[in-house]
Curated annotation (Swiss-Prot):
It comes from the Bacteria. InterPro entries: Arginosuc_syn_C, Arginosuc_syn_N, Arginosuc_synth, Arginosuc_synth_CS, Arginosuc_synth_type_1_subfam, AS_cat/multimer_dom_body, Rossmann-like_a/b/a_fold. The keyword Transcription regulation does not apply. PROSITE patterns: ARGININOSUCCIN_SYN_1, ARGININOSUCCIN_SYN_2. Pfam families: Arginosuc_syn_C, Arginosuc_synth. This is Argininosuccinate synthase.
């Protein structure tokens, strides 16, 4: 197989691990390497990745750096939030939702450069290997996939560092680099490893990089207004912005008020339990607001059906099935439900809390004060409720007459 692979597209961050993979691919597969670096809002300068790739012998024309922030938010994050997707009741899927976009870009570059394979730096223990590879195989099943962590014998930090030194790969650590295994994008930051491998141990205070500690948040609450169009956020406090700008603004507001920290143990697709800590400030606000606007614009049974289907939808994303018939079927249903999810939601942010204090929809609200008022009304005949209750109780009445006990 190795001799058949002449060109490989590598998901490349410019960091130590993927730089070692780059050199390993050149040596082990004797392949030409194409690098792809995605800007999905991780907050790092990406041009150093270009310089690093050049220093490792990658041709200038084989270095791809793409700004995918708006595509990430518009086509992936917003699509997911239309479903109110949460995995196992808590996780907002910040890492999971980024992987299909990266897989798609890898395949597009492989097709453009006539590459034989793609490669990634995900380990053989985690979910990301599944997400990258399911996505790639769905989009181009003819591409080979190289996962070095499943092949090489560089199975310790010491061996990796020795390999880097042997091949002249810069191993100087950035002064601000976290010792934790981190993943960052415009939706979240995740932390794994070190003290977090003990589920009973409290995370170190200096681990968190984004959301303020509650003791450091303002002592005054802040009221904001979010506007939705067909289920997607379109404005904050009346200001229209691009999808990436909207999420960035929500992140700023949420982080300021201590919103979005999470410490959970989740069930990985590969079978093991894993502890992760997450910061999702903007997503936490967005979820609350989206459910609030749905509460006045969605039909009851449509809303309940969405809630029943959501865990399946969330699991599909978590497990890597973004490019699958079943996810696309669910997405079509979800998107159909959002046609009338238009309006504004007012929220109060304070000390880690997101409180809905108002919601309105000029043309799509199903909330009728005339029907639900506690005052006298002329539209609802309360006598009708007697027949409604009797028909719904009919099975209980029949069972009771037959001596059934509940």
């Amino acid at each position: 197989m190795k001799k058949d692979i002449k060109k490989v597209v590598l998901a490349y961050s410019g960091g130590l691990d993927t730089s070692i993979i780059l050199k390993w691919l050149q040596d082990e597969y004797k392949s030409e390497v194409v690098t792809f670096t995605a800007d999905i809002g991780q907050g790092e300068e990406l041009e150093p990745a270009r310089k690093k790739a050049l220093s490792l012998g990658v041709k200038e024309e084989n270095i791809f750096i793409k700004d995918l922030k708006d595509e990430f938010v518009k086509d992936y994050v917003f699509a997911m939030f239309r479903a109110n997707a949460i995995y196992e009741g808590e996780y907002l899927l910040g890492t999971s939702i980024a992987r299909p976009l990266i897989a798609k870009a890898l395949v597009e570059i492989a097709n453009k450069t006539n590459a034989d394979a793609i490669s990634h730096g995900a380990t053989g223990k985690g979910n990301d290997q599944v997400r990258f590879e399911l996505g790639a195989l769905a989009l181009n099943p003819n591409l080979a996939i190289i996962a070095p962590w499943r092949e090489w014998d560089l199975n310790s930090r010491e061996k990796l560092l020795a390999y880097a030194q042997k091949h002249g790969i810069d191993i100087v650590k950035k002064a601000d680099k976290s010792p934790y295994s981190m993943d960052a994008n415009l939706l979240h930051i995740s932390y794994e490893g070190l003290v977090l491998e003990d589920p009973a141990a409290k995370p170190e205070a200096d681990m968190w990089r984004w959301v303020r500690d509650l003791k450091q948040t303002p002592n005054e609450s802040e009221v904001i207004e979010l506007e939705f169009s067909k289920g997607d956020l379109c404005a904050i406090n009346g200001e229209k912005m691009s999808p990436a700008q909207l999420l960035a603004k929500l992140n700023e507001l949420g982080a300021k008020h201590g919103i979005g920290r999470l410490d959970i143990v989740e069930n990985r697709y590969v079978g093991m339990k894993s502890r992760g800590c997450y910061e999702t400030p903007g997503g936490s606000i967005l979820l609350k607001a989206h459910r609030a606007i749905e509460s006045i614009t969605l039909d009851r049974e449509a809303a309940h059906l969405k809630d029943e289907l959501m865990p399946k939808y969330a699991s599909l994303i978590y497990n890597g099935y973004w490019f699958s018939p079943e996810r696309l079927m669910l997405q079509a249903l979800i998107d159909e439900s959002q046609k009338h999810v238009n309006g504004k939601v007012k929220l109060e942010l304070y000390k880690g809390n997101v409180m809905v204090i108002g919601r309105e929809s000029a043309n799509d609200s199903l909330f009728s004060e005339a029907y639900c008022t506690f005052e006298e009304d002329s539209v609802y005949d309360q006598k009708d409720a007697a027949g409604f209750i009797k028909l719904n109780a009919l099975r209980f009445i029949i069972a009771g007459k037959n001596g059934r006990k509940f």
